Structure formats: C-alpha cells, structure tokens
C-alpha cells in the first residue's frame, strides 16, 4: 500500500517547472516580465543556441536587496502581493513567485544584482535548485540573470525540443510581443552575438511597431481609441490592404499583459466588417486598460488566458473603435504599389549567363546588395520543416528578414505614463452581434468618375479628378446588389407578389424533415413555404425584392444553405443569403456591357455605404494617381545639367 508523503522542495519545483517552463522562450518570458515589474527602462536579452545553452537577461531596474536574494529562489516568495485582497488587484506581470525557483530547478542559474544606495551587490549561484554560493559582488544597479544548461537534469524535456531555429523563433515572438506591450522600454535581443530585435523605448507605440514590423507596415496602420467607464482602448490596426494569412499578427494586451482571447479577436474582425478578404486577417496592436478588479489573470500557468468581466461591452468598444477609424480613411488601394508587389512576388528565377565586365567608375558604383522589404518578405509563403511546423509567422518574419537591424531615427525618449478581464458562454446572441458588421457600414466619400471604356468584358475604366480608376465590374455589381438585398431580405412587412402558377419544391425525406424544423428562418426572410404532399412544399407568393425569373433557383439555393447549417442565427442567415444572391446574380467576367449600363453601375456604386469592397472583401476598384502614371512613363526624373551648362566645353 502506497503512503502519502510530502514531496521534497526540489522535486516540487521541478514539477512546477513542467507547467511554467515549457521551453527556452518560457525562461525569456518569465525573466523579462520580472525585469519589467522591477521598473526597468532598458532590457537586454542574450541567448546562445536558441537559449538551451544560455539565456542572459540584463536590466536596469530596482534590483534585489542582499538579504532577499536567497529568498527569491524559494517557491511562492514574491514582492508583488501581500494578502488575499491583492490577488484581485494585480497590476504586475508576475505575482505567484514560481518562475525563478522553477527555472533554477532545471538549470544552472547565476544571479547578479544590486540596489540603489547599497555598498555592494550580490552574486548567487544555484545548480538544479540547490544554492551553491551567495557572495558580495560588484554590480551596477539592476539585475543580471544568467541561465545555463537548461533542462540538464530533465533529459526527457530536452528530447521534445524543436529545432534551434524553431526555438529561436518562439523567443523572437515573445520579445516582439513584450516590445509591443511596453513601448516605453528599450528591448534588445541578441542571439549568438547577432542582434535580432531592437525597440527604441520612446513610449511611442507606432515606433515600436516600426521596429518590429518595419516602417512600410507601420505607415499602413491607423490609430484607434475608445473608452467607457470601465475600459480604455488604444492602439493601431492595419488598413484592409495590409493583411496576413492567419491571426498571429493580432496582439492584444490588458494592462500591459499579452493575452489570447477568441472573442476579442472576433470583435476585431467585426470592426473591419466586409472590408477584409475571406481568409485574410489584419495586423493589430491593441492595448486595453481596465480596473484590475474586472480581470482575473490567475486562471492559467502562463497567464495568457484572462477572464474579463463585462466582456460583451468590451467587444462592442473594440469593434466600434476600429469601424470608426476605418470610416475616416480612404480605402481605395494604390494600384502602382500592388502592381510592384505582385511583380516581385511572381518573378521567376532564370539562369543568367555571366559575362565579365570591365568596371568603369564613370558608370558603375559599388553598392551593397539590396534586400527585400519586410512587407515583401511577409507576403512570401513560409515553408517549414517538420520540426518547425508550429513556428509562428509572427516570429518567422523577423527571423528571416534580418541580416542586421534596420537603422531608425527616433525622437528623444520621454517617460511614458501607463496604468496598470471572465469568459461567458458563446451563445447565439454573440453570433448575432458578430454579423451586425454587414448591417452597419457607414457611407463614405466616393470620387466622381467619368467612364470611358471596358477591357476584356471584365474591367471598367474611369477618370477622376486625381487619376485613373479601374473597376472590377463583377465586384462592383456584387456590392450594389448585396446592399439592395441586405435592406430587403427579411422585411416581411413589405408586399408579397401572388403567383398565378404556384411553384412546387420536392426534397428527399431527410431534407424535408429538417426543412420543416427550420421553416421559421425562411419566413424571417419573407419566404413562406407550405407543406404540399409527401416531401413537397408549395410557394404561392414571393417577396417583391425577388425577381420572378429567379424564384425557382433562388428558393432552392436558400433551402440548400439552410440544410447545410446546423445552428444559425437569423442575422447570419440573412447576411449569408444576401452575399450568396448578390454573387450569383451579378454580371460575370467576359461580359460586355454598353456605356449606359456602365455609367449606371458606377452611379449605383457611388451610392453604396461601402463602395470599396465586395461582400467577400475583395477590392472593387484600384487607383492610379497622375503621379503614378508619370512615374511609369519616366516623366518624373531628376533635373539634369548638361556638360555645356557646367562649362566643360
């Protein structure tokens, strides 16, 4: 019979390390968060062999007093909370007192620290959780923690480490998120002597974004802000033209802590409405400041999952902040820039014959080989080995683009003033709110266009005051019809058109049973089917908005959609129905239209709430400015001075 015993402290720490310290990136995260809590303004992270050989964090924070250094390695010893009430008012990133002892239990840890006003600092060395020495030492104010031979005494953990490149990418990802969370702190990440990431620490979030994503991406991000009595939201989101293939570029922070939250991600997408293409996601860096009492961060070992009170109100604030900022922007993509990116992306490599050329200083100048911009790198498909499949593209972009850090000139640093969330069940009400995006798009200014031609029966050409516009005729009519259907579908108060000859619809037995259950959804959009014999339904009238020639195919399409969905809200059903019908009933490519129809389409487009995107998020029109055209035809050139003018002859 086995007996209950109390585990030795070292074994208990190793068990705790299994939850807190998953990989080298976890060490970096915990130690850097400690440095942030210590009031640091500069943090340097140095790693070797992706952190498995060495992780060293140096900060200029408050430091640790000599008589508290050894205590810091004991479990649940912390300076951040004092009593139970503090657990509900957490303003620091750490609070459990688990990280340092957990790290020390699976590594060789050296800690060098000093506090302001002390005559000397303190050096502590621990191996596998056992303190080997604590001695006075010379040290600047702050703390340096060096973690070596990680997992040396837990070989099973080493067995499951990914490749060094994958582990390094996780570290870059962590540092990037921390840099975005705290733009007032200067972060520097050095791997095997090579600087991988640097932020300026000026307190300007846009500058931190530029240091991580690049200047090109930072320029295409717009500021958002919103607030109520409980929440204050600020940050940046990308314009719809700048997107990524996954959600890894969405960063959410609550009181300076990076979190993952599905519902808030959903709220971000709601704010964009149909301005995003299907399957594409924006870049977003959003800070949320709330009373710590409304957020419970003590629900997960990594503290990345946070329960938020009044989460639905917060979702509404986030989506409104984004929608309001986008409303103020001109969302017509720059055609010349997109063309340049497409050319770079699709260019094929060809074998070139290398001919020896005599270099002439009159015509040639030695230059450094150019590198693709960050935006170009991000748009390439990233191929990973089996060992690196879980690598986030967020970190991969930073890793791949660097040969040396970009040189950015930042303003003089100013101290930033910053303050230090309960998951309800996902119900149909929240889904309804998600689909409000297709019903609240605001009217925008639209250029006056003069139609003058069509190409390949697909694209319309028009001239505006500020250049050339090319319009996708299918996407344009799809947007026009979508807004018509959006307004009319489900308006059961409008008149019904009686049919002289009713339509009979027949379905398989199982489909007929399911349709009977879901018939109220059809009635919500103004379609009333009555049972008529076995597995048959009869339609005696139809809503005015449905053209008579579209009745049979339209009703079957609506029923098919209804049968494919298991649980669906009325708003979702209406939105999807409007999108489906607008797509199927719009003019297709390779279809020529006369000048009158083209001008009428452009007029209808100008009256739309959102004339810039089709319901699937694709652009309706692109814009070449006059300056763009002059650049393409080399009409804009630098001024040249002739040799005669220079007095050479």
From Swiss-Prot:
PROSITE patterns xref list: DNA_MISMATCH_REPAIR_1
Pfam families for the chain: DNA_mis_repair, HATPase_c_3, MutL_C
GO biological-process terms attached to the record: mismatch repair
UniProt entry keywords in alphabetical sequence: DNA damage, DNA repair
Gene3D superfamilies associated with the record: 3.30.230.10, Histidine kinase-like ATPase, C-terminal domain, MutL, C-terminal domain, dimerisation subdomain, MutL, C-terminal domain, regulatory subdomain
Source species, domain of life: Bacteria
GO molecular function: ATP binding; ATP hydrolysis activity; ATP-dependent DNA damage sensor activity; mismatched DNA binding
Assigned GO CC terms: mismatch repair complex
This protein's record includes keyword DNA damage: yes
Task of the protein: This protein is involved in the repair of mismatches in DNA. It is required for dam-dependent methyl-directed DNA mismatch repair. May act as a 'molecular matchmaker', a protein that promotes the formation of a stable complex between two or more DNA-binding proteins in an ATP-dependent manner without itself being part of a final effector complex.
Similarity-based family: Belongs to the DNA mismatch repair MutL/HexB family.
Stated name of the protein: DNA mismatch repair protein MutL
Organism of this sequence: Streptococcus pneumoniae (strain Hungary19A-6)
Lineage of source species: Bacteria, Bacillati, Bacillota, Bacilli, Lactobacillales
Gene name for this UniProt entry: mutL
């Amino acid at each position: 019979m086995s007996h209950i015993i109390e585990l030795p402290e070292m074994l208990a720490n190793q068990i705790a390390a299994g939850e807190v310290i998953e990989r080298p990136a976890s060490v970096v995260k915990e130690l850097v968060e400690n440095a942030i809590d210590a009031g640091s303004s500069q943090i340097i992270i140095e790693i070797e062999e992706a952190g498995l050989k060495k992780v060293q964090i140096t900060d200029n924070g408050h430091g640790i007093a000599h008589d508290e250094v050894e205590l810091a390695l004991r479990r649940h010893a912390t300076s951040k909370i004092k009593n139970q009430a503090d657990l509900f008012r957490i303003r620091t990133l750490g609070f459990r007192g688990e990280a340092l002892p957990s790290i020390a239990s699976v590594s060789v840890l050296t800690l060098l620290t000093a506090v302001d006003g002390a005559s000397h600092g303190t050096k502590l060395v621990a191996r596998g959780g056992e303190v080997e020495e604590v001695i006075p030492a010379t040290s600047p104010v702050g703390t340096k923690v060096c973690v070596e031979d990680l997992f040396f005494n837990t070989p099973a953990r080493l067995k499951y480490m990914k490749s060094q490149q994958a582990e390094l990418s996780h570290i870059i990802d962590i540092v990037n998120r921390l840099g975005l969370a705290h733009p007032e702190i200067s972060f520097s990440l050095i791997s095997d002597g090579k600087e991988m990431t640097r932020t300026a620490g000026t307190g300007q979030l846009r500058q931190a974004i530029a240091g991580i994503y690049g200047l090109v991406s930072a320029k295409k991000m717009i500021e958002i802000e919103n607030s109520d009595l409980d929440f204050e939201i600020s940050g940046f989101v990308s314009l719809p033209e700048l997107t990524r293939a996954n959600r890894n570029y969405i960063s959410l922070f609550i009181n300076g802590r990076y979190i993952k939250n599905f519902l808030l991600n959903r709220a971000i997408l709601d704010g964009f409405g149909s301005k995003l293409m299907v399957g594409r996601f924006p870049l977003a860096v959003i800070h949320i400041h709330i009373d710590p009492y409304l957020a419970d961060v003590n629900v997960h070992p990594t503290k990345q999952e946070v329960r938020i009170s009044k989460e639905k109100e917060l979702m509404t604030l986030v989506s409104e902040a984004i929608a309001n900022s986008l409303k103020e922007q001109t969302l017509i993509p720059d055609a010349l820039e997109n063309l340049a990116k497409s050319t770079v992306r699709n260019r094929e490599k060809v074998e070139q014959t290398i001919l020896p050329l005599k270099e002439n200083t009159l015509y040639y100048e030695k230059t450094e080989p150019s590198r693709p911009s960050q935006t170009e790198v991000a748009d390439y498909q990233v191929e990973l080995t089996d060992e690196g499949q879980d690598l986030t593209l967020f970190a991969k972009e930073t890793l791949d683009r660097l040969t040396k850090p970009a040189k950015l000139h930042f303003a003089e640093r100013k101290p930033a003033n910053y303050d230090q969330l309960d998951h309800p069940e996902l119900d149909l009400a929240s889904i309804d709110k998600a689909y409000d995006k297709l019903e609240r798009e605001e009217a925008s200014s639209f250029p006056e266009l003069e139609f003058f031609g069509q190409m390949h029966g697909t694209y319309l050409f028009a001239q505006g005051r500020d250049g050339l516009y090319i319009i996708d005729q299918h996407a344009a009519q799809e947007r026009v019809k979508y807004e018509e259907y959006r307004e009319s579908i489900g308006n059961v108060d409008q008149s019904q058109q009686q049919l002289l000859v009713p339509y009979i619809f027949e379905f398989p037995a199982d489909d007929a049973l399911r349709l009977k259950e879901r018939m109220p959804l059809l009635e919500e959009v103004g379609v009333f089917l009555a049972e008529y014999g076995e597995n048959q339904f009869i339609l005696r009238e139809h809503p005015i908005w449905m053209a008579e020639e579209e009745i049979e195919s339209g009703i079957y399409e609506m029923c098919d959609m209804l049968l494919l969905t298991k649980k669906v809200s009325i708003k979702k059903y209406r939105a999807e129905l409007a999108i489906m019908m607008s797509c199927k009933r719009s003019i297709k490519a390779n279809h020529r239209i006369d000048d009158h129809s083209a001008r009428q389409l452009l007029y209808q487009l100008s009256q739309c709430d959102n004339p810039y995107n089709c319901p699937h998020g694709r652009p309706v029109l692109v814009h070449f400015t006059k300056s763009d055209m002059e650049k393409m035809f080399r009409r804009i050139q630098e001024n040249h001075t002739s040799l005669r003018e220079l007095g050479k002859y």
